[in-house]
């Protein structure tokens, strides 16, 4: 049965947002107009972001036995989103030819969605340790050895429509500012690639 992760904070890191819009990691000079828009759009984003996360923990025998789950005692599956409102607002800016504002708001949305995923990752790692199991790093469909087609399996497990998240024909999530991932729970710590534990 799927459960919700409650009280998800919205975290927005200016450096990561600036990197997403094309600035180097340690820019010496940032255009004043960019900084002004960043402040304005962060305020706007806080009104638009609706952070949600659903998860379910399955025994290995309940999974589809994909090789990425090898050696896991259990596997946690998670779906995170910030909702559709920010994306709609950003698209509106692009349609109005306000490209920089649209780009900045879109980057803020990406940072916010990843922030929800980081919060969920930590919550699920803590849950693993409560079960006396060892969590892996999170892994998402389409990365490394987990094909994008596995997105369907995640959506079979989790009631994504409760959060307003769907898959299109290309297996991309709508709203786009959504993140899905799996996390293996191991009985033996030797199998985990995670460097630190809560």
Walk through the language-model features, giving the residues of each.
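General structural feature for long, well-ordered alpha-helical segments within catalytic domains
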Residues: 37, 41-45, 116, 120, ...
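Conserved mixed alpha/beta catalytic, RNA-binding, or beta-rich assembly cores of soluble enzyme
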Residues: 69-141
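Short terminal or interdomain "cap/linker" segment that borders an active site or interface and mediates
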Residues: 82, 131-198
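Generic secondary-structure signature for well-ordered alpha-helical cores
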Residues: 43-51, 125, 129, 159
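Catalytic cores of large soluble enzymes that bind and process phosphate-bearing ligands
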Residues: 30-37, 105-108, 112, 116, ...
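Active-site helix-to-loop segments that bind/position phosphate- or nucleotide-bearing substrates
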Residues: 1-101
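Generic structural signal of hydrophobic/aromatic residues within well-ordered alpha-helices
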Residues: 17, 45, 90-91, 104, ...
């Amino acid at each position: 049965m799927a459960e919700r992760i409650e009280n998800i904070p919205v975290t927005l890191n200016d450096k990561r947002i600036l990197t997403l819009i094309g600035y180097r990691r340690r820019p010496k000079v940032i255009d004043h107009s960019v900084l002004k828009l960043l402040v304005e759009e962060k305020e706007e984003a806080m009104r638009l972001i609706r952070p949600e996360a659903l998860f379910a923990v399955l025994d290995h025998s309940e999974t589809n036995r994909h090789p990425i789950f090898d050696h896991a005692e259990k596997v946690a599956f998670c779906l995170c989103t910030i909702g559709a409102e920010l994306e709609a607002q950003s698209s509106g800016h692009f349609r109005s030819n306000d490209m920089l504002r649209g780009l900045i708001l879109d980057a803020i949305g990406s940072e916010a969605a990843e922030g929800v995923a980081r919060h969920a990752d930590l919550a699920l790692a803590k849950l693993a340790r409560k079960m006396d199991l060892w969590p892996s790093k999170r892994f998402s469909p389409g990365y490394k050895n987990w094909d994008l087609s596995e997105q369907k399996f995640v959506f079979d497990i989790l009631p994504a429509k409760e959060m307003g998240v769907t898959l299109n024909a290309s297996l991309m999530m709508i709203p786009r500012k959504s993140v899905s991932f799996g996390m293996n729970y191991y009985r033996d710590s030797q199998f985990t690639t995670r460097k630190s534990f809560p």
